[in-house]
Amino acid sequence: MTERFDCHHCNESLYGKKYILKEENPHCVACFEELYANTCEECGTPIGCDCKDLSYKDRHWHEGCFHCSRCGSSLVDKPFAAKEEQLLCTDCYSNEYSSKCQECKKTIMPGTRKMEYKGSSWHETCFTCQRCQQPIGTKSFIPKENQNFCVPCYEKQYALQCVQCKKPITTGGVTYREQPWHKECFVCTACKKQLSGQRFTARDEFPYCLTCFCDLYAKKCAGCTNPISGLGGTKYISFEERQWHNDCFNCKKCSLSLVGRGFLTERDDILCPDCGKDI
């Protein structure tokens, strides 16, 4: 007796018929398609064994149903894009959804690298420095009057040049006599200490810290021999080409302050009228 060879589902004999194995169990074509065939997203009918089953993200189509939702062109073996569960050819997707390049006004195709800034988009090769025309890419840039500049070009064209080192001032800076300086370049002419944020004065247009200015140029007190800066409201007495701090202008003998008083001189000394009686 011949061994039976039947469909695992309907038990119909498979001798002389097409069959399909599923987990090593034979099925007739009709049962296999009923039980296991995927349903086409487009037409809603099973995708039979004699048809190509095209799939995308767990969705399936007959080969003839796999087309653009807008223009109907076939997407078989062509690039496509998905938008809200619909499949679109690249032309239809670009026309409806792709951004336009701010520079060349052409569509930025899906999958193409693009640059975005403040709501505008560029092809990567179109996002260039206004001055040198080189692509900016992921490098730093500076916008100026609706134009974009790479940092070196911006500094050459717009940044102030330090009067001392002649290099661009990109941050901060100091203005002295209407000329720009880097903070680190604006230093005392004598000791080279930075003057930014410090009190300073000038001699022949050269800046000096107060200490160096006093040491170099200030008059010396005839009493204590220390410099009289004359800065910041410092008061002093001047008499016959000699100067004294107010606190140092005292009688040589009794140390009485002579500020606002009459006095006498004895050689290099100054005396109050009472001490001067003995001269």
UniProtKB/Swiss-Prot annotation:
Tissue spec. comment: Highly expressed in heart but also detectable in brain and skeletal muscle.
The record's keywords, sorted A to Z, are:
Cytoplasm, Isopeptide bond, LIM domain, Metal-binding, Nucleus, Phosphoprotein, Repeat, Transcription, Transcription regulation, Ubl conjugation, Zinc, Zinc-finger
C4-type zinc finger segments:
7-31
Q: Which residues carry this modification: Phosphoserine?
A: 238
Which conditions up-regulate this protein? Answer: Up-regulated in hearts exposed to isoproterenol (at protein level).
- Cellular component GO terms, alphabetical: nucleus; Z disc
- Swiss-Prot/TrEMBL puts the cross-link Glycyl lysine isopeptide (Lys-Gly) (interchain with G-Cter in SUMO2) at 78, 167, 220
> What InterPro entries does the database record attribute to this sequence?
LIM_FHL1/2/3/5_N, Znf_LIM
The protein's predominant localisation is cytoplasm
Which Gene Ontology terms cover its molecular function?
bHLH transcription factor binding; identical protein binding; transcription corepressor activity; transcription factor binding; zinc ion binding
Q: Which cysteines are joined by disulfide bonds?
A: none
- Which ranges carry the LIM zinc-binding domain? 40-92, 101-153, 162-212, 221-275
**Any idea where this protein resides?**
Cytoplasm; Nucleus; Cytoplasm, Myofibril, Sarcomere, Z line
One Pfam match, given by its short name, reads LIM_FHL2-3_N
Instruction: Respond yes or no to whether keyword Secreted is given for this record.
Output: no
- Any one of the GO BP annotations: regulation of transcription by RNA polymerase II
**CDD domains for this protein:** LIM4_FHL2 (cd09433)
Which parts of the chain span the membrane according to its record? none
Q: Tell me yes or no: is Repeat among this UniProt entry's keywords.
A: yes
Alphabetical list of PANTHER family matching this protein: FOUR AND A HALF LIM DOMAINS PROTEIN (PTHR24205), FOUR AND A HALF LIM DOMAINS PROTEIN 2 (PTHR24205:SF3)
Q: What does this protein do?
A: May function as a molecular transmitter linking various signaling pathways to transcriptional regulation. Negatively regulates the transcriptional repressor E4F1 and may function in cell growth. Inhibits the transcriptional activity of FOXO1 and its apoptotic function by enhancing the interaction of FOXO1 with SIRT1 and FOXO1 deacetylation. Negatively regulates the calcineurin/NFAT signaling pathway in cardiomyocytes.
Q: What is known of its domains?
A: The third LIM zinc-binding mediates interaction with E4F1.
* Assembly: Interacts with ZNF638 and TTN/titin. Interacts with E4F1. Interacts with GRB7. Interacts with SIRT1 and FOXO1. Interacts with CEFIP. Interacts with calcineurin. Interacts with FOXK1.
**UniProt protein name:** Four and a half LIM domains protein 2
Q: Which organism is it from?
A: Mus musculus
What gene makes this protein?
A: Fhl2
